[in-house]
Amino acid sequence: SSSHITVSDVVEMVNEYDAIGTKIGMIKKHEIADYCSDALKNGMDCRYLAYRNESIDKQTTAIRTMLHGRDVQSFVVGEPVVSLTGIQNVINNNHEGVVTAIGEPVLCHGIACVSVTLDDCLTVNAAIDVKEKKNKEIGFFRMFEKLKAQSQITTDFRAKAELLEQAQEASAQGYMIKDDIAELRPCVASTVHKAQGSTFDVAVV
C-alpha cells in the first residue's frame, strides 16, 4: 500500500541525517525494542534496520525477549525467519518463511543445530548459534589457505604432498559446514543492505 516505507526511503533519511547532522525520528535508542515489539504484537510488519551486525544482534535479542520472554530459544514456532546465506538446491539467500516445526538439538559437524520447518514445507538444519557456524566455517577455509601457502614454499615433495592433502581436508570440512547448515535469523531486524528492495509497515533505523 501507499503507507509502506521502502528501504530506499530509509537510506535517503539516513543519508540526510549524515549530511546535516540532525536527529531524525522520535524514538530513543532504549525505546526501540519496546516500539518494535509493540508493532509486531499488533500484526504490523515491523523491521529494525541498521548498518552494523552488532546493532542487529543486540536489538534482535531485545525485541525477541519482549515478544517471547527472557528464556526465548533461537527459534519459535510461528515466528518469521530469514536465511542469511544460500545453500544450493536447498534454500536461497534472503528466503523468508514462518517456522512451523522445530526438531530436537543435534550436532552437525560439531555444531549445535536444530531441524527447522517453514510454512512452505521447506526443512533445513539450522545453526542454533550462527556466529559459531560462521567462525568454524571461516576457520577451515583459512586453514586451507595457510596449508596451501606452506606447500608452495617447501622443497620437500613428501611434505608438500602432506600439506596439500591436509589443505584439501580443511577445505572439504569448510564446504560441508557451508552446504549442510543453514543460517536463519528472526525477521525482527536486518541490515540496510539485506533489506534493499523490501517494504515494511514500520521501519525503525
Region locations from a protein language model:
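Conserved helicase C-terminal RecA-like lobe
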Residues: V98, V106-V205
